[in-house]
UniProtKB/Swiss-Prot annotation:
It comes from the Archaea. The gene is hisI. Belongs to the PRA-CH family. Its cofactor is Mg(2+); Zn(2+). Binds 1 Mg(2+) ion per subunit. Mg(2+) binds at residues 76, 78, 80. It is found in: Cytoplasm. It catalyses: 1-(5-phospho-beta-D-ribosyl)-5'-AMP + H2O = 1-(5-phospho-beta-D-ribosyl)-5-[(5-phospho-beta-D-ribosylamino)methylideneamino]imidazole-4-carboxamide. This is Phosphoribosyl-AMP cyclohydrolase.
Amino acid sequence: MPDLFPSLKYHDGLIPVIVQDAKTLQVLMFAFANEEAVSLTRSTGYAHYFSRSRNKLWKKGEESGHLQKIVRICVDCDEDCLLYLVEQTGCACHEGYASCFFRTMEGEVILPRLKDPADIYSR
């Protein structure tokens, strides 16, 4: 099987990444990665992303301790989107929820908050 890393299609230097819990398949979050983040994710076994708001590379959990250990990386049929299947430590969401998708379009919160965000980032 060929390594698809060289053929990934980045838009403005970024590729979308969907993140799922490897056991439950719950969607945990969505983020972007640049080539360096994808390379670091593959070499370290832990999820790395590129923050558009901070304009920098980041390792998920570097401040909170809520790491994402990579179980598998899948590539979509167009090679322009990645799916990380992970073992999540702690919360995936910086708001203290297991998933960033914790509310409906109507604003109803459908997941319990696991941690107070102030506690997550006061380490």
